[in-house]
Amino acid sequence: MDEMKVIEIIKKTLKFSNENIVKGIDDDCAIIKIDENFYLVATTDMMVKKAHIPSILSPYEIGGRILTANVSDIASMGAKPLAFLVSISLSKEEANEKFIKELYSGLDDFSKLYDCPVVGGDTNRGDELILSGTAFGITDNPIYRRGKVGDDICVTNDLGRVYCALTLYYMLKENKISYKEFERLCQKYPKIIEKLRKPIARIKEGLLMNKLINGCCDISDGLGKEITYFKNFEIYSDRIFKLIPEDVIEFCDAFNLNPIKVALNSGEEFELLFTTSKFNKVKDSLKGYSKIYKIGKIIEDGQFIDGEEFYGGGYIHKW
């Protein structure tokens, strides 16, 4: 069983709603109508140590990461962050003052970056570190995962660095390289390891694009998975190649990786994948903040890459 099947079971089981719920399961955030002009958006994301937290991350970086992962969903809705709740389960290893202070220092610094204060949560004891965050935002125009036929499909900035960083991490973890070699490679590819350690949610971009785009989601599970939420599309590998940074190309050459597959499968990038019929206006609105790249089009029917059936990608939890 995979997470998509689990979600389908949950959706079929949960039947009750009310007139305040505009959108529940099936988008980056739930959308709740406050009044005629504003919507509350809410999202939750969880990090489990063994599944999500590389051992090379510091407690400070873990704190920043859980906040970024949640706030990135707020960004994809074109909303302004309001507040953040975080619940933690600590094992004996983490239940000490040093770890807790560092973790919450990361949360505090990133909350200032996103203007999203941490306002509460819960604490518990467990066998391993687990963090569960809930972020709230507000908007007058929530952006869904969708597109209109003919829309350009676009991505902010670049993709691939997180995949490369995790490749290095697993090489170290599986004893394929020494720690000394790992440190050398981190120094050789500083931007690659930095994207893993300190990812940034595109809050400003989401707000600036709000009235100019038709659909959006954040790239948390990889472009290859997120693109399928837009249902019918054609994307092009030569365009995807243009948003792959030089250090990722160099890394792929050094370690015999396909850069297109790396870009499609690189998760937790937290860039924005969006659809628009106003590419030039979006580009102008983001000057000084982010570059954007066209990678394809919304079409009438089907999912294709370079004219062939799309083979998918990205990360899906499996049991």
Curated annotation (Swiss-Prot):
A single GO BP: thiamine biosynthetic process
Binding site for Mg(2+) 4: 28, 43, 73
Entry binding sites for ATP: 104, 121-122, 145, 220
Annotated positions binding Mg(2+) 1: 44-45, 122
Catalytic reactions of this protein: thiamine phosphate + ATP = thiamine diphosphate + ADP
SUPFAM superfamilies in alphabetical order: PurM C-terminal domain-like, PurM N-terminal domain-like
Coiled coil, from the record: none
EC class of the enzyme, as a word: transferase
Annotated InterPro entries: PurM-like_C_sf, PurM-like_N, PurM-like_N_sf, ThiL-like
Top-level taxonomic group: Archaea
Pathway: Cofactor biosynthesis; thiamine diphosphate biosynthesis; thiamine diphosphate from thiamine phosphate: step 1/1
This enzyme's EC code(s): 2.7.4.16
Matches recorded under Pfam families: AIRS
Listed GO MF terms: ATP binding; magnesium ion binding; thiamine-phosphate kinase activity
Binding site for Mg(2+) 2: 45, 73
Disulfide bonds: none
Amino acids binding Mg(2+) 5: 221
Annotated residues for binding of Mg(2+) 3: 28, 73, 218
Protein family per UniProt: Belongs to the thiamine-monophosphate kinase family.
Misc remark: Reaction mechanism of ThiL seems to utilize a direct, inline transfer of the gamma-phosphate of ATP to TMP rather than a phosphorylated enzyme intermediate.
Entries under HAMAP family matching the protein: TMP_kinase (MF_02128)
Function per UniProt: Catalyzes the ATP-dependent phosphorylation of thiamine-monophosphate (TMP) to form thiamine-pyrophosphate (TPP), the active form of vitamin B1.
Full protein name: Thiamine-monophosphate kinase
Organism this protein belongs to: Methanocaldococcus jannaschii (strain ATCC 43067 / DSM 2661 / JAL-1 / JCM 10045 / NBRC 100440) (Methanococcus jannaschii)
Gene name in the database record: thiL
